[in-house]
Amino acid sequence: MTARTCSIYKNKRIVCFGDSVTQGVPHVAPADTFAAILERRLNALYGPQVQFCASNAGVGGENTAEGLARIQRDVLDHSPDLVLIEFGLNDIRYEPAKRLSEEQFAENLREMHRLIAERGAAVIFMTPTPIIGAYHVYSQGTDYYKQWGDCNGLNAIYAEIIRQVARELEAPLCDIYAAFVQEAVKAEFRGETFDYRDLSVLSRYISSRDGVHPTAAGQELIAAELYAVIVTRDLLVTRV
């Protein structure tokens, strides 16, 4: 699968590079992915002076090693101005063919950043969405994750690795994991749950069908978080 191309010229190109969260499967229409929402909101903000194209280069089921294998075709060949890197949920899968060590995961992120930066593009690292263990098939189908409490326990460790790599490389971070957890905390405040750590309260944002993929509302939340990072840091356009 290759990145979506744009039918008309635009001044700024964003490539959203990641797994099924970026792709928007299996429950989200293409127009409701964070890539599409972000494109619309940035174009609404800057109007005709600057136009944006956000290409969706998400492929479901991929870890960072598989992402690196297609980075030339799906990212670099599109001459992006900004690349959003969203991986991690498949790097922690229990199957040996998918699972990557913490060290390899971090090194793959560094290599992605190096290749993109060499082309003169900016990078935003994204942490993964939380996993709702009660709905998640991997959490229920194996004892592998018990050493971390549950699958989301390991997910949180890999989210922290992304934060560390972003700090190390002095790259912007969009902390999606923290944003979703904050929504759970707000739900606890409103009395909708007795414990925000029971992430099932996030079923509006993360599908109860699988406990991992964002719903349309979750995609909108991701887009809003990315929008905030881009416009407050003037990553693509300096606002006058």
Predicted regions and their residues:
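Alpha-helical cap/lid subdomain in secreted, periplasmic
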Residues: 8-10, 37-47, 66-239
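Short, solvent-exposed mixed-charge patches
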Residues: 1, 239-240
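Serine-esterase "nucleophile elbow" of acetyl-processing enzymes
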Residues: 1-60, 65, 70-79
